[in-house]
């Protein structure tokens, strides 16, 4: 492929569908190496991390690397991995994920053919350094390509409570976002109805005995409420039965 210096321009699309340049950087491409540029931070003060790693010829195996782009750059995680279906207690400690560093990990069950990871299905766990309490667990991941997989932890805005995602990068232009299988969500409700009466909103999951209700006056915004992952039925009512 192409080698030598390459200029990269990063831009975003604003609310008027116009391109706004974030920054321009130059990277040096090397023969037989992959170059990964990670943009993090915010648009006003972007952070660019550039990583290089050797591209190997792999057969029925893959390599595993990871880094972190959490807002708090001091945040680190211990990385564990198990064969699909095995609990955390059977997982193998691979090492630490650190911001600003791209770390490669060693397969715990290498053989004479290769010390790289076998193509298979796995579960990945993250803990705080030195802890055995899981703070992030992936669903079953099919790591079935003979390539280099790069894992990137990042902050996640939105309804998920712990606010973290794990991105999985391959050779393609697609980035696979993985969220915690046990992540809880949050919701809040705004009563915008033109009525003098308060509205009662009820969230009902699989267990009707644990239904959550909140009453809101006109124009009132409720607090964030945490709920477990799952499907919910939402009902709203007013005391005079004008809304159901």
Language-model-detected regions and their locations in the chain:
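Intrinsically disordered, low-complexity polar regions and short flexible loop motifs
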Residues: 1-244
């Amino acid at each position: 492929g192409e080698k030598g210096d390459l200029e990269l321009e990063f831009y975003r699309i604003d609310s008027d569908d116009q391109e706004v340049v974030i920054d321009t950087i130059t990277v040096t491409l090397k023969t037989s190496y992959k170059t990964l540029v990670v943009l993090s931070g915010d648009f006003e003060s972007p952070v660019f991390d550039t990583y290089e790693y050797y591209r190997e010829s792999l057969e029925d195996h893959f390599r595993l690397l990871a880094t972190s782009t959490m807002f708090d750059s001091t945040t680190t995680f211990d990385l564990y991995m198990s064969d699909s279906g095995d609990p955390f207690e059977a997982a193998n400690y691979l090492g630490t994920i650190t911001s600003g560093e791209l770390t490669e990990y060693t397969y715990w069950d290498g053989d004479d053919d290769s010390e790289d990871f076998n193509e298979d299905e796995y579960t990945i766990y993250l803990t705080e350094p030195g802890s055995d309490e899981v703070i992030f667990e992936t669903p079953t991941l099919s790591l079935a390509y003979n390539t280099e997989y790069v894992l990137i932890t990042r902050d996640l805005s939105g309804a998920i409570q712990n606010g973290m995602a794990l991105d999985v990068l391959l050779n393609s232009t697609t980035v696979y976002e993985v969220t915690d299988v046990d992540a809880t969500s949050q919701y809040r409700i705004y009563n915008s109805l033109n009525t003098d009466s308060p509205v009662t909103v009820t969230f009902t999951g699989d267990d009707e005995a644990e239904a959550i209700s909140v009453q809101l006056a006109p124009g009132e915004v409720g607090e964030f409420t945490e709920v477990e992952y799952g499907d919910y039925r939402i009902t709203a009512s007013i005391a005079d039965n004008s809304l159901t």
